[in-house]
Amino acid sequence: MLDKRKFYINGKWVSPSKPNDLEVINPSTEEAFATISRGSKEDTNSAVSAAKQALVTWSESSKEERVGLLEKLLDIYKKRYSEMTEAISMEMGAPMDWSRDSQTSSGQSHLEDFIVRLKEFKFDEQFSPETNNRICYEPIGVCGLITPWNW
């Protein structure tokens, strides 16, 4: 059984502030295949604090640096493709072929699309040549998202 009870916070894998394990069940076998941790308010606060600290340097990074990081992430994704396919298959109780061809491939497609769009994105736009009015896009802060359906 996989042990995935640590959180990645501030560049390190850390144990939760309080043990609160949850077994992840494969719907097709009804058997547990992994143990994860339920985060606490303290864990969330640690992650948000670390993200706020990281925002200081991230907000000053260039488009090229951000593209480089996404390309590195995409390279790691590709190297771990079969591992992710297997994890998605177990989590969803789905056939491996469908997990690989539909789910894992869509994650890769999203990263590839983000890279293309970031390369094209204008962080600073002038309204017209006659004015000095501009739109400047900057990171504004840390966001917490709760999304449905594993997305």
Question: Where do the protein language model's features map onto the residues?
Answer:
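N-terminal Rossmann-like NAD(P)+-binding subdomain of aldehyde/semialdehyde dehydrogenases
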Residues: M1-T131
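Conserved small-residue-rich beta-alpha loop and adjacent elements
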Residues: D124-W151
